[in-house]
């Protein structure tokens, strides 16, 4: 759960950033290269930012399962009665993206929140 908390939260941060930078005029391919050439490069960043660059969200890990894992971690914080600041935002983002999933359709990928952000920014 600890690894999923870190990696999924990182994926969600990139999912939020790519559409915003695109709206501001930065080419997603250039942004991808910036991260690939930075100290932030790791397996998670490469795997997810490639999806965000291409706006292709092939199912590799279901968003519903990632949300469930993050919810388990949230309960751990609640057991100690302390806030989970970053986690709360990540869970909110996941829930907004999950609401876009149409009933009866295949599961959406953990990368789909990027597309949700594009929708929120008015970019189809």
Residue ranges and their predicted role:
Residues 1-117:
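Helical "substrate-binding/catalytic lid" subdomain
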């Amino acid at each position: 759960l600890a690894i999923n908390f870190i990696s999924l939260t990182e994926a969600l941060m990139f999912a939020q950033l790519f559409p915003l930078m695109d709206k501001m005029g930065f080419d997603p391919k250039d942004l991808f290269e910036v991260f690939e050439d930075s100290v932030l490069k790791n397996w998670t960043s490469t795997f997810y930012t490639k999806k965000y660059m291409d706006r292709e969200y092939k199912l590799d890990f279901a968003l519903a399962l990632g949300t469930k894992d993050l919810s388990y971690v949230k309960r751990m914080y609640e057991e100690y009665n302390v806030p989970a600041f970053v986690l709360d935002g990540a869970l909110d983002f996941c829930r907004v993206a999950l609401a876009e999933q149409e009933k009866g359709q295949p599961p959406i990928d953990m990368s789909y929140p990027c597309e949700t952000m594009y929708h929120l920014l008015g970019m189809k």
